[in-house]
Amino acid sequence: MRRMTLLLAVMAAVLVVASGVALARDFVGTDRGERIVGTDSADTIDGNGGDDTIIGKLGADRIRGGNGKDKQYGGRGNDVIDSDGGFRDLVNCGRGIDTAYVDARDQVAGCERRR
């Protein structure tokens, strides 16, 4: 019984990988600057502190840069980018109908809605 369960679990994992399905994930950064790259699905990404580079890729992503001078790229999909942390950030929403919460000092491109 255990072998059958293990075999079925392995087969399911192989099918997911082979089909190219990217499962959505939650990413949380640290207080150091880092590069965080999402999946091809709808992700939730929080850069936390530091000067981060965040790339959402495909899917309707929710991206929050946090404290620091962040570079945030939404990619394809209807993304929500939160960049109103008081630092001068770079926000590029990408393709899709995107919403960006930004400060007056942020450099913003490709966002259909700015708040």
What are these regions (language model features)?
Residues 29, 38, 47, 56, ...:
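Glycine-centered beta-turn/loop sites at beta-strand termini
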